[in-house]
Amino acid sequence: MFENYDKENMFESIWNFPNNLKDAIVLGNGIDLKNDYSHINNIVIAGMGGSAIGGDIVSVLENSNIKIPYTVCRDYSIPGWVNSSSLVICSSYSGNTEETISAFHKSIERGASICGITTGGTLLKLLKENKKDFIKIPSGLQPRAAVAFSFIPLIKLIEKIGLIKSELDLWIEKSIDVLEKKRIIYSKEGNENPVYQLAQKIYKKIP
């Protein structure tokens, strides 16, 4: 029934979220850094939309583990204090987000260290041309459905650099187990589905 309304197939994206978490862990564990980051004393995540949300999730999950200033920047510019001791991580699913590309160029001007997370596009080209470390994530998803690939590789990257010691793997393992069980319950049609029951209760009502 829901197929008539789910034109962008978000059901499949949500169903696959536990699988994406597993794939993102594998991807993050395989990071191979070429550059030196031993001098870094602050981190900026430059991104928009789902990519910026990934940065927000990291801030919440690792708040007590990150021992240096950490901020998410949703803008064409970057904070005025960014300098050669800063790490700017440019995150754009498409690789063509204007604000993120602009932040990349401004980070170059400031002499900041730069890493990137993207599927390709202009950002990947710039990262390669400037010999910056990057994580290439899977394409073919809607950006808002690619959250697993916007926050897990980000945590793994910061951990690989040595700026945090995360317990992400244990947390994700438990989360995957819960999600795999819940997706079966929440994918049923009709009154067996608690989400369907809730929808019926609030239908034509203002919460």
Model-derived regions, located:
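Active-site phosphate/pyrophosphate-binding segments
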Residues: 6-9, 13, 28, 32, ...
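The first (N-terminal) embedded transmembrane alpha-helix
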Residues: 13-20
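Short, non-transmembrane cytosolic segments of multipass membrane proteins
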Residues: 1-5
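Glycine-rich phosphate-binding loops that contact phosphosugars or nucleotide phosphates
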Residues: 37-184
